[in-house]
């Protein structure tokens, strides 16, 4: 909570949401493994960190809970590490045990759409609701606009550019760059 009060103003809404998800997983782990609702931050050690990391990937999880792949678990651990670093800097703990975690991201293959696939997609006849989704995807492919930014676009974002043609003008949600 302290981290969100101090850092929340600097973080995007989606990043704040992700910190909340990490907290939810952490509290769930503490309830399941340690049978308590709250846990003293000063007694978090390497074993706690390693078991929480394993928990994120499926250890001790109920069947209906989503398991993280290693890269997703590492993102949660990165947020946990930042919070623990803040606790260390405020002298609430003597060391940050998350720093000792040794894990590496797995390389993921990114499948790119080639021009032929985009053309095929654009000619498929779909029901109206799926047609809109398809059109938005193709728009994103050609403009490079992220999904997050597309959800915030309105007519006001279409402006006359310096070449007198229609341009898209908006602030990027993630970086606040125009």
Regions found by a protein language model. Name each.
Residues 7, 37-40, 64, 109:
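Residues marking the start of alpha-helices
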Residues 66-70, 74-78, 89, 93-147, ...:
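Basic, Lys/Arg- and aromatic-enriched nucleic-acid-binding interface segment
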Residues 1-23:
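Short, aromatic/basic-rich helix-turn unit that serves as a nucleic-acid recognition element
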Residues 14, 21-32, 39, 47, ...:
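N-terminal DNA-binding recognition helix of tyrosine site-specific recombinases/integrases
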Residues 102, 108-109, 117, 152-178:
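Conserved tyrosine-mediated DNA breakage-rejoining catalytic core shared by Y-recombinases
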Residues 35, 62-67, 129, 161-166:
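Short, solvent-exposed loop/turn segments that connect beta-strands within catalytic domains
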Residues 32, 55-58, 62, 89, ...:
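Conserved helix-loop functional segments at active or binding sites
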